[in-house]
Regions:
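Terminal amphipathic alpha-helical/low-complexity segments used for targeting or macromolecular assembly
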Residues: 1-9, 14-15, 20-21, 57, ...
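Structural signal for interior beta-strand "rungs" in well-ordered beta-sheet cores
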Residues: 4-191
Length: 274
């Protein structure tokens, strides 16, 4: 560890493993079980504690806290963890709590994520790569978010909710149920309003894939009959298309919160995207 990269006012506990190229700013606090990879930047007054591993290039900005105990009254100091993947940025005043014994004991954030100011990642959450949480987003414990999801500012996500990859959540939403991959939802309480069509186009999904997803969405959420019957029909008609198969697998997977269904804005959203 290079003393030149650590501000003299920072408090670094004996035992912390800090790469030579990592930097620690003024008045930051780094606990004894923290591991900082190459190029990690820790801003002024940030707090890193517990068994916390930051991969190369992670940035922790001023006053953020990572690895503090979970907000779980059952937690009694067990050795749970936080892992943050390469190049992820945790902005000012954001909080990332370590796992609990009621979960897997791990809070994990993937690579190239952006956790904006004052966002909260609760215990045992899993965020895959390229997830963006805008300002003041609140994730309850045990939330799962797939890759390349955007969550708008001020949104609250209930504990144990799953959000499938490439979904988009509108700002100021209250998300109580699982959101399908590629879905778009908003509102208090949030309801599906269609697909994340803009995101799909920006990320290079072709016309064939988008058309199949739109047909599947209409069949699942705007069709007639029971939901199970609609799932079976979509599987029959479009189940060979990879993204549709992903949605069907998401629906069939175990869920503690249940699946979010479409709201009244769906018809308008789909019409505008046509």
């Amino acid at each position: 560890m290079s003393v030149a990269n650590i501000h003299p006012t920072a408090i670094v506990a004996e035992g912390a493993a800090i790469a030579a190229s990592a930097t620690i700013g003024p008045y930051a606090t780094v606990g004894a079980q923290v591991v900082l990879g190459e190029g990690v930047q820790v801003g002024a007054h940030a707090v890193l504690d517990g068994i916390t591993h930051l991969a190369e290039g992670v940035q922790i900005l001023p006053f953020a806290s990572v690895g503090l105990p979970p907000q779980d009254l059952k937690y009694k100091g067990e050795p749970t963890r936080v892992e943050i993947g390469p190049r992820t940025i945790v902005r000012e005043h954001a909080t990332v709590h370590r796992g609990s014994v009621g979960g897997e004991g791990l809070t994990r954030i993937g690579a190239d994520c952006l956790i904006m100011c004052v966002a909260h990642v609760g215990h045992d959450c899993v965020l895959e790569d390229r997830v963006i949480l805008a300002n003041n987003v609140m994730l309850g414990g045990h939330v799962y978010i797939g890759d390349t999801v955007f969550v708008g500012g001020g949104t609250a996500v209930h504990q144990s909710v799953r959000i499938g990859r490439q979904a988009v959540i509108g700002g100021m939403s209250g998300v109580e149920r699982d959101v399908i991959p590629f879905g778009s939802c908003m509102g208090n309480r949030a309801r599906l309003i269609g697909l994340n069509l803009l995101g799909l186009k920006r990320r290079g999904f072709g016309r064939e894939a988008i058309n199949a997803l739109r047909a599947a969405y209409r069949g699942l959420f705007l069709g007639r009959g029971t939901f199970d019957a609609r799932v079976a029909l979509v599987a029959q008609d479009h189940g060979n298309q990879p993204q549709v198969a992903e949605i069907l697998a998401f629906i069939e997977a175990s869920s503690r919160r249940g699946l979010m269904r479409a709201g009244r804005q769906t018809h308008e959203s789909e019409a505008e995207a046509a």
